[in-house]
Curated annotation (Swiss-Prot):
Assembly description: Monomer.
Coiled coil: 809-880
GO biological process, one term: valyl-tRNA aminoacylation
Name of this protein: Valine--tRNA ligase
Main function: Catalyzes the attachment of valine to tRNA(Val). As ValRS can inadvertently accommodate and process structurally similar amino acids such as threonine, to avoid such errors, it has a 'posttransfer' editing activity that hydrolyzes mischarged Thr-tRNA(Val) in a tRNA-dependent manner.
Reaction(s) the record says it catalyses: tRNA(Val) + L-valine + ATP = L-valyl-tRNA(Val) + AMP + diphosphate
Assigned protein family: Belongs to the class-I aminoacyl-tRNA synthetase family. ValS type 1 subfamily.
One Pfam short name: tRNA-synt_1
Keywords on record: Aminoacyl-tRNA synthetase, ATP-binding, Coiled coil, Cytoplasm, Ligase, Nucleotide-binding, Protein biosynthesis
Motif ('KMSKS' region): 525-529
Binding site for ATP: K528
Gene name of this polypeptide: valS
Presence of keyword ATP-binding: yes
């Protein structure tokens, strides 16, 4: 390395540090998987973000965790593939493009299918570029040579292959079922696209008269407009109130239609009246009951949410207008006898905001039970998927054990077209990877597949499957770890697992690292309606990518939610700034040392031996914790080592030899500074890639980039437990003296007398050997160390391991003045404690104040109380 580069700018400026660095990494191909047979492969596929807009903080968190894992594994000598890509996000993207067209006064039907798809591809290209620029700002070590998109030709081929194979096995079928229907976009929705909101509604209590005139049966509903499609009333067969009515007939109000009373175990005798109206075309549970009792399915709505011909005089009315009118009519007929206000959870379309309608529709489905059974069996074997934290395995298995068939068709244009064709004359269905030969006689299904269908194949379709001889598939599949949020374990993780088992015969990933959701500093979910969302790019512009990454990675444990606050990001910036300043100091004192001149074989001080011991401990701890994905704990250990051990202690102690006359000691200290900084930057690199690369490039080093530098390993001969114990005692002594100085308001510049009474001669000897450090950091005019130190009047004392420190106050401070000053401080703190306690005992405040405000007040109470006790203790010591 050119020694002239061993200087760094005075100030830490993240934008300057991060500028052009990513291009250097990408152009150097440091992130590309090398297909090196000498190295063990390690694979991660990125959860593909939707091409609908900007990445949010959740994406930044998720991808930072993956980057940490892959950077570390690359440094550990693995042939790492971190495969990037994006999801076409069917309904989400189509909704965005349609909104754009509406602004131009157009609809997709004005353009036609081909032109609309052309428009959507243009949208995709624009936003894909934007997402790549955000990946770059975050510093993600992605292999762009293998980037994939869920509508790529290769992935489309895999989708068709899977559809056909499942169809041939009887696991894909076409049939009628109740699906989530969005009347605004006129398409089926997956469960994850339905957002539940509490809505003020009502229970409408009605009496359906028995045909024989012997009475009536009471039912209640929140959707009275659906009664027009009722085809039965159900009761529990063991219900003594109603079992004699099973098989009888009631007259459906308004319509005059006769419908049966059926007995079904599904009915909860304890809920409501114990009798329920059955509308098989508008409720999933009613649909199942209808199947069991062979009931007619009467659909009373159109796809746009208006009432159809079966709704009689209400035909053409909007469903909610119909509700109002039908309530009036039922009241007039005398069958509606009570309206009970009720807040209930109602599904809304994530895209359009419309109230979702449970709707009978002919759709394509995957028969889930056989696939789920295979996934459940896998978890009983050694080849199971390991969930981190493992509690999420129960969540996963619960979903798999209670699985329903999966509706996979969507009434959209953007997506994978269903590979099914219908003969124009005979109506015969043909399913195939390619179109039938006489294509002119066939019409392809107009629907597309649910986005999750292609996403479920992501780990292997991106590797070249169904070509099982593809080099990447053979080498890099199955993958090592999937990093994702707990909110999509069912919708995505579970589907990848059962498709992986079905089509590759093995789990698609060994581990699943689950993280939580990002919330604001009050613990609320980030949302547009609350206006509390944060753009990660804004955070990067202000504090740099490294500060954001470090906060995201170390701010919580696996599976836990993360509270975002700018104050916490600022504190990580302060950490980065501390590292920068410490590195500048080290480099300024290296005197142009080259990599070849590094020499750690010289005689070492206790501080040298201690910092090397602590480095070894940190390397081992960090490596073990990172392998368990405990990045919060990794961050804590790195922070403590860098801030406390290296910056606050070792660098200060290193100034003694660096500013001294002993050239051999100087050389050893410089070498240790360079070595510890180098190893520490490597440990920190996966978390703060830009800063560590910048510092490492200024250090004496071998190699082109820290991204491919070797991961640190503990050097056994550098561990010296005796020196570590000596240093621990030294630090205790120095800290205790500093605390006493602080308590009696005496600055370090003012000399003190210091007596150290040890419990054994050995401890006295150890302290005497390191006397220069005690003198350097406590500034005594007199220092006595021994076992026979006599008691001193009017002195402050402190106890450390094996010794008592005595610091005489005579001549150091005016004791009466100090007591007076402390008394004023005590009075002030007492008032603060009383003020906070008064607030916390106020019932009105406790009822009305937000939880976080109450917590803040409780924290203040604890803080003021602790400070008051400390001042009381000091006053007592001074008086005695």
């Amino acid at each position: 390395m050119d020694n002239q580069e061993l200087t760094m700018p005075t100030k830490y400026d993240p934008s300057a540090v991060e500028k052009d660095r990513y291009d250097y990494w990408v152009n150097g191909k440091f992130f590309e998987a090398k297909n090196d047979p000498e190295k063990e492969p390690y694979t991660v596929v990125i959860p593909p973000p939707n091409v609908t807009g900007k990445l949010h903080l959740g994406h930044a968190w998720d991808s930072t965790l993956q980057d940490i894992v892959t950077r570390m594994k690359r440094m550990q000598g693995y042939d790492v593939l971190w495969l990037p890509g994006m999801d076409h996000a069917g309904i989400a993207t189509q909704a965005k493009v349609e909104a754009k067209l509406r602004e131009e006064g157009k609809t997709r039907y004005d353009l036609g299918r081909e032109k609309f798809l052309e428009e959507t591809w243009n949208w995709k290209e624009e936003y894909a570029d934007f997402i790549r620029s955000q990946w770059a700002k975050l510093g993600l070590g992605l292999d762009y040579s293998r980037e994939r998109f869920t509508l790529d030709e290769g992935l489309s081929k895999a989708v068709r292959e899977v559809f056909v194979k499942l169809y041939e096995k009887g696991l894909i079928y076409r049939g009628e079922y109740i699906i989530n229907w969005d009347p605004a976009t006129k398409t089926a929705l997956s469960d994850i696209e339905v957002i539940y909101k509490d809505v003020q509604g009502a229970f409408y209590h009605m009496r359906y008269p028995l045909k024989d005139g012997s009475g009536s049966i009471e039912i209640a509903t929140t959707r009275p407009e659906t009664m027009l499609g009722d085809t039965a009333v159900a009761v529990h067969p063991e219900d003594e109130r109603y079992k004699h009515l099973i098989g009888k007939t009631v007259i459906l109000p308004i319509t005059g239609r006769e419908i049966p009373i059926v007995g079904d175990d599904y009915v909860d005798m304890e809920f409501g009246s114990g009798a329920v109206k059955i509308t098989p075309a508008h409720d999933p549970n009613d649909f199942e009951i209808g199947n069991r009792h062979n009931l007619e399915r009467i659909l009373v709505m159109n796809e746009d949410g208006t009432m159809n011909d079966n709704a009689l005089q209400y035909k053409g009315m909007d469903r909610f207008e119909c509700r109002k009118q039908i309530v009036k009519d039922l009241q007039e007929e005398g069958v509606l006898f009570k309206i009970e206000e009720h807040t209930h959870s109602v599904g809304h379309s994530e895209r359009s905001g419309a109230v979702v309608e449970p709707y009978l529709s002919t759709q394509w489905f995957v028969q889930m039970q056989p696939l789920a059974d295979a996934a459940i069996e896998l978890q009983k074997s050694e080849g199971k998927v390991n969930f981190v934290p493992d509690r999420f395995e129960k969540t996963y298995l619960h979903w798999m054990e209670n699985i329903r068939d999966w509706c996979i068709s969507r009434q959209l244009w953007w997506g994978h077209r269903i590979p099914a064709w219908y003969h124009k004359e005979t109506g015969e269905i043909y399913v195939g990877v390619e179109a039938p030969e006489d294509a002119e006689n066939w019409e392809q299904d107009k629907d597309v597949l649910d986005t999750w269908f292609s996403s479920a194949l992501w780990p292997f379709s991106t590797m070249g499957w169904p070509d099982i001889d593809e080099e990447d598939f053979k080498r890099y599949y199955p993958t090592n770890v999937l990093v994702t949020g707990y909110d999509i374990i069912f919708f995505w993780v579970s589907r990848m697992i059962f498709q992986g088992i079905e089509f590759t015969g093995e789990r698609p990933f060994k581990d699943v690292l689950i993280h939580g959701l990002i919330r604001d500093d009050q613990g609320r979910k980030m949302s547009k309606s609350l206006g509390n969302g944060v753009d990660p790019m804004d955070v990067i512009d202000k504090y740099g990518a490294d500060s954001l990454r470090y906060f995201l990675a170390t701010g919580s444990s696996p599976g836990q939610d993360l509270r975002f606050s700018f104050e916490k990001v600022e504190s990580t910036w302060n950490f980065a700034n501390k590292i920068w300043n410490a590195s500048r100091f080290a480099l300024m004192n290296m005197d142009g040392m080259t990599y070849e001149e590094l020499d750690l074989s010289g005689e070492k001080s206790v501080a040298d031996k201690w910092i090397l011991t602590r480095l070894n401990e940190t390397i081992e701890t960090v490596t073990q914790l990172a392998d368990k994905y405990e990045f919060g704990e990794v961050g804590r250990h790195l922070y403590n080592f860098i801030w406390d051990d290296f910056c606050d202690w070792y660098i200060e102690m290193a100034k003694l030899p660096l500013y001294g006359e002993d050239e051999a000691a100087k050389k050893t200290t410089r070498s240790i500074l360079a070595y510890v900084l180098d190893q520490t930057m490597r440990l920190l690199h996966p978390f703060m890639p830009f800063l560590t690369e910048e510092i490492w490039q200024h250090l004496p080093h071998e190699g082109e980039s820290i991204t491919v530098a070797k991961w640190p390993e503990a050097v056994k001969e550098y561990t010296d437990t005796e020196a570590a114990a000596d240093m621990k005692l030294l630090v205790e002594v120095i800290r205790a003296v500093r605390n006493i100085r602080s308590e009696v308001n005496t600055p370090l510049s003012k000399q003190i007398e210091l007596y150290i009474k040890t419990s054994t001669p050995e401890i006295a000897e150890r302290l005497e050997e390191n006397r220069s450090y005690v003198e350097r950091f406590t500034n005594p005019s007199l220092l006595q160390i021994g076992t026979d130190i006599q008691a001193v009047d009017k002195a402050m004392t402190a106890v450390v391991s094996g010794a008592e420190l005595i610091l005489p106050l005579e001549g150091l401070i005016n004791i009466d003045e100090e007591i007076s000053r402390l008394q004023k401080e005590l009075d002030k703190l007492t008032k603060e404690v009383e003020r906070v306690q008064k607030k916390l005992s106020n019932e009105g405040f406790m009822k009305k104040a937000p939880a976080h405000v109450i917590e803040e007040e409780r924290a203040k109470e604890a803080d003021y109380t602790a400070k008051r006790e400390a001042v009381e203790k000091r006053i007592a010591e001074l008086k005695n």
